[in-house]
A protein has these predicted regions:
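Conserved donor-binding/catalytic core segment of Leloir-type glycosyltransferases
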Residues: 37-54, 60-64
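Aromatic "clamp/platform" in nucleotide-sugar-dependent glycosyltransferases that forms part
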Residues: 118
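A short, well-ordered alpha-helix in the C-terminal region of glycosyltransferases
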Residues: 182-196, 208
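Nucleotide-activated donor-binding/catalytic signature segment of Leloir-type glycosyltransferases, i.e.
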Residues: 81-101
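Donor nucleotide-sugar binding/catalytic pocket of nucleotide-sugar-dependent glycosyltransferases
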Residues: 1-28, 39, 94
Length: 218
């Protein structure tokens, strides 16, 4: 509307809730994601492009403060070499690209999905993780708060604090890991939220827009 375009509407993004689902959690996949850190208690995961704008380095203080946690980075990109240096001497496993059911299983097998980027309008990977029943932590900025209900289906951290959200991200991670029952509740709520964003809901919304447009022009 600011550009002079009238009669606009926002069509929600769809996520495949049939392929991304909690029952794909497996010990075999957890072993793959843990790699040589298989004796570690908790599995933190990130899925996506390894690029500077994703601000993945913000996860390092979490590993420094939670010795029992391992990070699996699923994906690849131009920032991988730099990240390997940043995460040197931490329990971080660079997995590379995964796809199909293997990717869906990776989401479902993680304990927490970390999405530190503060520049996202809406992260599809967040919805995929939630569809797989993985509690998520994302930035309290952009479109992320539209899908993360803080303390219910995941947690929000504040990336604009003086420490760039370091303590906020650490606290959110510890909060989820500290309470198994709370974590299981978040997992179920995450799945419920994702179901509101599935392709069936997105299609119904689009059909509604078409019907309203045709009705107004009749």
């Amino acid at each position: 509307e600011d550009k002079g375009i009238q009669r606009t509407a926002l069509w929600q993004r769809g996520v495949d809730t049939k392929n991304f689902r909690p029952d794909l959690r497996s010990e075999k996949m957890r072993e793959k994601l843990f790699g040589k850190y298989k004796d570690t208690e908790s599995l933190l995961i990130y899925v996506g492009r390894l690029s500077a704008e994703k601000q993945i380095e913000r996860i390092k203080p979490v590993l420094d403060n939670i010795p029992g946690a391992c990070l699996a980075l699923v994906g690849d990109g131009p920032y991988r070499g730099q990240l390997e240096k940043i995460f040197e001497n931490t329990k971080t496993n660079f997995i590379g690209y995964l796809s199909g059911e293997e990717l869906a299983s990776a989401y479902a097998s993680g304990d927490i999905f970390l999405f530190p980027s503060s520049t996202e309008t809406l992260g599809l990977v967040l919805l995929e993780a939630m569809a797989a029943g993985c509690p998520v932590i994302g930035a309290n900025k952009g479109g992320i708060p539209d899908i993360i209900n803080d303390g219910v289906n995941g947690c929000l951290y504040d990336p604009d604090e003086k420490d760039k959200g370091e303590q906020s991200l650490i606290a959110a991670t510890k909060k989820i890991l500290a309470d198994k029952n709370k974590k299981e509740m978040m997992s179920k709520e995450a799945r419920k939220e994702a179901e509101q964003w599935d392709w069936n809901q997105a299609t119904l919304q689009l059909k509604k827009y078409y019907s309203e447009t045709l009705g107004n022009n009749a």
